[in-house]
Swiss-Prot record:
GO biological process, one term: ubiquinone biosynthetic process
NCBIfam families cross-referenced by the UniProt entry: DMQ_monoox_COQ7 (NF033656)
Compartments, record wording: Cell membrane
Summary of the function given for this chain in its UniProt record: Catalyzes the hydroxylation of 2-nonaprenyl-3-methyl-6-methoxy-1,4-benzoquinol during ubiquinone biosynthesis.
Protein encoded by which gene: coq7
Source species taxonomy: Bacteria, Pseudomonadati, Pseudomonadota, Betaproteobacteria, Burkholderiales
Catalysed conversion reaction: a 5-methoxy-2-methyl-3-(all-trans-polyprenyl)benzene-1,4-diol + AH2 + O2 = a 3-demethylubiquinol + A + H2O
Annotated protein name in UniProt: 3-demethoxyubiquinol 3-hydroxylase
Principal cellular location given in the protein's record: membrane
Organism: Ralstonia pickettii (strain 12J)
Length: 217
């Protein structure tokens, strides 16, 4: 357990501090490349102040979501009983690190900041992940599947409300959505069970609190 705790603690510090590095190219970079190849301007640089604030609020919410994803996966992996399940959770967490780095970069580009409450979000999510992990792999995987289903719905909403001209944010969110769908599918295929309705409803309520606060703070 101690052998896993040390690297997980390091990962936690990096997630909260916002110093993670992506292992994959940022999807937003393709927007710049496309604009350059066609000699067109990147419209994401022409956002009105209202659109900039709205896009930054949504990307801050997404950044918080990725901080929470790191914590959830780390808490679950720490108590996973099947080594194969632990490996699957670790691999998903590494992809979520990409999302975290992309969102952090986009917030900088929008001249905004991450949530001031990130340490609180991380601590709460880690505790939830650890409890899910202690309840057994099937429940833990079911929690992953339900979380990713709700995140997919949440990202769909962001794609509906992000400014059309903010092509960089939209590219990041679209790739995140594809990854989250795959993570949820993998969890179900690995044996994740459907969670009871009261738990799903509690998860949605907690998500609403987080997204409302993170949009502003």
């Amino acid at each position: 357990m101690l052998d896993r705790f040390i690297p997980e603690f390091d990962r936690a510090l990096r997630a909260v501090a916002g110093v993670t590095r992506a292992s994959r190219p940022n999807p937003a970079d393709a927007v710049i490349a496309s604009a350059a190849s066609t000699n067109t301007a990147d419209n994401a640089t022409k956002l009105s102040e209202a659109d900039r604030r709205h896009a930054a609020g949504l990307m801050r919410v997404n950044h918080v979501g990725e901080v929470c994803a790191q914590a959830l996966y780390q808490g679950q992996a720490l108590f996973a009983r099947d080594p194969a399940i632990r490996t699957q959770l670790d691999e998903a967490a590494r992809e979520e690190e990409d999302h975290l780095a992309w969102c952090a970069q986009r917030l900088q580009e929008l001249n905004d900041r991450p949530s001031l409450l990130n340490p609180l979000w991380y601590a709460g999510a880690f505790a939830i992940g650890a409890v899910a992990g202690r309840l057994g792999d099937k429940i833990s995987l079911g929690f992953v599947a339900e979380t990713e289903r709700q995140v997919e719905h949440h990202l769909d909403g962001h794609l509906d409300t992000l400014p059309e001209q903010d092509t960089r944010s939209r590219a990041i969110v679209a790739q995140m959505r594809d990854d989250e769908i795959r993570h949820g599918d993998n969890a179900r295929q690995a044996g994740g069970i459907d969670l009871p309705a009261p738990i799903r409803q509690a998860m949605r309520a907690a998500s609403r609190v987080m997204t409302t606060a993170a949009y502003r703070i």
